[in-house]
Amino acid sequence: MDRVKCMPREGSDRLLAASADMMHYSGCSGKIRIDSCYFAGAQDDPINVHGTNLRVVEKLDEHTVKLRFMHGQSYGYNAYFEGDTVAFVRASTMERFASACVVSVKRLTDRTVEVAFDRDIPKELELNHDCVENISCTPEVEIRNCYFTRTSTRGTLMTTPRKVVIADNTYYKTGMSAILIEGDAEGWYESGPVNDVLIQNNIFIGCAYSGGPENAVIALHPSNMVVDAERPV
């Protein structure tokens, strides 16, 4: 995305340009590059990048499970493809405890899918609790020279395990954290443990005045329900 303007039409006297996120990327691969864009008047995050954790609801045989999209605003698309690498995720701790390769995918309904793997389902898997994350469909992200203003939520929400660069941007009075790094498996089910993020040369003006984790301008906030100091996520 180069020089894209997400904002009310000039002269329209409107304050809002979107009722939710403006640029929302879910389950992508490759590289997402957003350069010299302008965001104003979003009612949710101007930029949101993440994967999706699907809950394991049934074990069909030693290699096959039934998975379910859990959030009512995120379902009905192809989340897995033959040959993809996946991780089994403990929902309470957000830890990846096993991996496998997808052998076949069968869509059952808009909310459920049957997936077969190249190895046995982990014995420690907890049905109706743990999730499966697609590791293959995770993008690199580069956001540069952008301007974020007049949003009641975050400026940039980032959840991907691949390299992320957020540089030379201006965040002006975002209501919550200007940059939020977060993942969960029991709420929005937005997946992707973050491993490599560079945030540099950005300008933050009056951000996080109305909320966000501890009103932090840059917030790292994994939503794991169980916290273990010996095994941080």
Over which residues does each language-model region extend?
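Extracellular parallel beta-helix/beta-solenoid repeat domains
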Residues: 1-233
